[in-house]
């Protein structure tokens, strides 16, 4: 008698569908099949479903797939085996139209995706035939030397993680570049060893800036790219005070936003005056003084602010001491600060 090797389990080819919260057949329910990670109840997302016959032939069927009273999927009242040719999403609804289950992707890898990745792995194995691995002395550090891999192949296919204590790479164009960007091709940083100039640099492709590491004995100096006069002037101008040097003028600090303004008002002018520049946020305060050219005046006047806001103000002079009243009023000077 020959030795029997059992390797096939006798089981039902059809799946029993039950309710989510209790072990009961999902009677008169419906099954929808669609593209992975989509809503299969939407017709545009649905994919073709087939009935697989005993002889292996298939027959396309329409959706939704009905569930009988016992909980089995049926076609024209007959229990059948339903299949698809690719991974799919599946939604199960009960007889009242309530969703019982939803699966975004039935298979972790669809047949087509597995075929594509298998082809890449085979290509990796073929390229690794030209590699050698050795041990450095008593250390457990491995040295991996790759000479059979072209630049084009390495650029397109080096997405898998590589673990090695030391990695020797030789580039045909003289520059060895490690691209630290995203696997989807998004911009990132490049760590490059420039062979001709004997220096190491890090280049950020997102901001287009370069950090250079020149070779130094004992001390590593990090230097920035040389700026042109135009670039230096632009940096200085971005932080220095701006000003309008007129009789009624202003100056502004770009770092803090503080604004200082000044001006004069004619002797007896009590009309509303506008600041040379309106304060964007607030008027913090004002200082006032008379500008007197004649120290023999027999009358003294003091300037006063009648009203003021971010845009303008009113001011006047008031008599402080009595005298012979034979001297004219003097011009009024003011200074304001705000931001």
Curated annotation (Swiss-Prot):
Keyword Magnesium belongs to the record: no
InterPro entries on file: Gp53-like_C (IPR054075), P22_tailspike_N (IPR009093), P22_tailspike_N_sf (IPR036730)
Intracellular or extracellular location(s): Virion
Annotated GO CC locations: virus tail, fiber
Organism the protein comes from: Acyrthosiphon pisum secondary endosymbiont phage 1
The keyword Nucleotide-binding is annotated on this UniProt entry: no
Name by which UniProt lists this protein: Putative tail fiber protein gp36
Chain's role: Putative tail fiber protein.
